[in-house]
Each structure stands twice: as structure tokens, then as C-alpha cells.
Amino acid sequence: MLIPSNRTKRECILSRLCFLVLSVWVSLPSAAQNNPYKIDDALYPIYQRASKQARQQEGLLVADTLYQQALKLGDKKAQCLAYIIPLQFYISQKDDSKIEKASTDLKEISRANNYLQYYYHAWSSEIIYFLNQQRSLLALQKAE
């Protein structure tokens, strides 16, 4: 009859303990975001609603709600996404002064929150808007 050594017993106990810890860790709910924008999952449905209504006045209200909730949760990326909605709305309304203000606001928050992709989104959206309006000179000035 084989009598296990102390070393073998320790290895067996250690492997069972590792298996137990790993099993518990895998079964814990993940805190990661499960949406394409990697924002807080509680904010994603609000963003979707705001995005769907971006060409309507109601979209501005939903975007404001998104921003306020993102502030409470400390989600800086969602704060930037909330500022995209007004820019989209004013572009659809062809309101030059409000487009410029919405673009400036988005640029400021994106720089403050260190999400520069949204800075460039604001910048390129403005340029594309002016190009589509046959105002190439203004678009070139914005590009400089």
C-alpha cells in the first residue's frame, strides 16, 4: 500500500485550494462594462435613447440627463458622449452659432477628461458641416 508523503499531501491540498479560489473568482459578477463604448452599464441605455433622439429637441434633455448621471457616477467618457448629442442636434438644425458653441463645449470637456478622440470628433464634425454647406473657405479656416 502506498502511503502519501507530506509533500504530496501539501501539493494536493494546495491544488484543491487553488481550484476552489479560481472557481469562486470566475463565478463572481464582472464589474466591466458590457457595451461598445465601455461606459457604465447604467448609462448606456440613456446614451442610446439620447443618440436616437439626437435630431430632436428631446434629445437635448436626454443628453443633459446622461451628463448629470455620468457626473454622479464619475464616468468621464459618458460625460463626453453626452456633449456629442447637442452638436449633432445643432448640425441637423443648421444653426452655425450653436454648432460652434456645442463644438467648443465638447472640445473643452474632452480635453479636461482626457478623451481626445471626442475633441477631434467635434473638430471634424464642424469642418464636414461647413464643407457640406459649400463653405469651403470657412472649413479650411477651421482646419488650420
Region locations from a protein language model:
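A "functional boundary" signal
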Residues: 2, 32-144
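Bacterial Sec-dependent N-terminal signal peptides
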Residues: 1-46
